[in-house]
Amino acid sequence: MSSSSGPLSPQSTTATSSLAAKAANPLSSKVTTVLSSSYADTEFREALALLDERGVQNTAETRRQLRLDLQKEVIDSNGEIIDEFAKVAEQLRRIGTTIGRLNETFNEMKTQIGSAQKTTSSTLIEASQLMIQRRQVEQKQALLGAFNTNFVLSEDETAALTLTSEPVDDLFFAVLAKAKRISKDCEILLGFENQTLGLEIMEQTSKNLNLGFQKLYKWVQREFKTLNLENPQIGSSIRHALRVLAERPSLFQNCLDFLAEAREHVLSNSFHTALTGSSPSGIEDQSVKPIELVAHDTLRYVGDMLAWAHSAAVGEREALEGLFIGEGDEIAKGIQAGRDNEIWRLVAEDGEVSDTFDAVETLNELVDRDLSGAARLLRQRVEQVIQTNEETILAYKLANLLNFYKSTFSRLLSVGSALVETLGALESEALRQFRSLARDHVAAIQGDFQHTPADLRPPEFLLGALEQLAAIMKTYETSFTSSSDREEEFEPVLAEAFDPFISGSANMAKPLRAPSNSIFLINCLLTAERSLSRFDFTQRRAARLQAQIQEERARLVETQYRFFRGESGLDSLIVQLEPLGESKEDIQKALLLESLQSPALSQASQKLDDFLPSALMDAMENLKNLQDSRLVQSITEEAAEKFCVDFEHVEEMLILVDEATEQKQNEQDDIQGPRTLFPRTSGEIRVLLS
């Protein structure tokens, strides 16, 4: 026992530990394996899930048989797979047999195709060549079709373009446009080395184009014969035709000439009907009130004729605008294109540049030509009226009326139009008649220029002339004039209707004595100035008359001044004292003057006293025939003021002389001073003359 319970030797201890470790290794290995297994491992989790699906119970029997069961299932599965692969192998054998038969069939077909290729190779080559030839033929056919389409007119198109039996419609204009395009495109063909084709096509196309334009030209002429410009709905075809025809400027101009002739005839007949109420053939128009019915009223008669011409011109212009301008500047472009295509226009001679077509100017010229026939008839009638008129004012009113319509037509047509020139000539003739009648009137009253009215009032011929001039000026004032200087324009009228009469009045005043000559002339000038000053276009002439009035007024002031000096008895005293001043030498000279001696000075004082009470009335009586009372008063007051100024100088000299006399009175008591003999003062004089 003791031996067994004693300490173990190292050898025995080591052996025991080794056995214990061997016994414990399988378990620890399993535990270690289990512990080291990761439940996150996919295969492990799938295995566990599979066990759950089988419903395996965790029993000792199950744990012993689990491995065997699993191996048995694997073996069974492998057997099933082998059976399936056997079926696949059988099918592969069948496929191999089928492929073998296909290879045999393919080889047979290959042999047959090879033999067929040998027999058909020549045919294929020929077919390929035929296909190439077919494509070439198709290309040529397409080229020929395109060529015919772009460079050749079909028979139907040629007939529509050239035959006059075919209408001028949209087809005609389409073919014409195509022909023009062909002609232009032929320039491309002429760029090739062989120009024969291009020349032939261009020659034929040009021929067809010329025939087409001739057909269009004749058609337009036929349309113009029946064209009614009064109809606001003018056909669009005629406008289109004119735009196209404009490419042939010569034909277009011929059409304009034809239209102008036709419209001239129509408007001439219309004007004749408006004048007489019947056509030139004698057919009466009941709807028209003849203008000739008012022939007795000269101004209205001429005005109605001019108004008709203006209305006709406006209507003609509006209608023709629809033909030539209503479609923009197509006509201008057509004419310019036609001019550019004319050979003689291609090179300008001497640098000459062809004028650009102006549609408005052409329209104005056409309207002017349309009215030329009516204008001739209008001129005949108006000339007859002017020549038979014997009234000066009416002659001027006619000239003014003609001037108004001349300005109106200048804006409507142009300054250089024949109608405006006709009206200008008629206006000049009316003015010549006016001047002639005015001069005849002056010549007829030459005898009246010799008889001045006793009361110095303006003569009757001047009053009549001013009344006539007033009527003329009212007419001119209401008239339309383009002149920037109306006064300058009206001067010729004043030269004929005013100057002879005012000059005659001035000549009548020359033989008269003062102040009658100035009074008469002022009366005439005042009357004339009042007439002229009412109008703005005679202000310069009125100012000249006012200047003449002031000249004559100055003469009357001087006359009245001389009257005051003479009638007051102070003239000699004023004359003698005027050059003297306040110096002692002048005072000594004054003492020796005879007019300052007692008798003469007393007499002058007495005469002054007698004159002063009625001086102003007597002075104004001198101007009683002057028709402007305010002017009489102003003239007299100015003359009195001059007299008072002179008297102040006299008074100053008398005071100085009186002072010198007082010194002598101390020596000689019998000497009287001038102020004693002449006590009047300048203040008293001003009061009495105011």
Curated annotation (Swiss-Prot):
Classification via Pfam families: COG6_C (PF20653), COG6_N (PF06419)
Region: Disordered, residue numbers: 1-22
GO BP field: intra-Golgi vesicle-mediated transport; protein transport
Keyword set, alphabetical order: Golgi apparatus, Membrane, Protein transport, Transport
Keyword Nucleotide-binding: no
Gene Ontology CC terms: Golgi membrane; Golgi transport complex
Subcellular location: Golgi apparatus membrane
Membrane topology, record value: Peripheral membrane protein
Family: Belongs to the COG6 family.
Role, per record: Acts as a component of the peripheral membrane COG complex that is involved in intra-Golgi protein trafficking. COG is located at the cis-Golgi, and regulates tethering of retrograde intra-Golgi vesicles and possibly a number of other membrane trafficking events.
Name by which UniProt lists this protein: Conserved oligomeric Golgi complex subunit 6
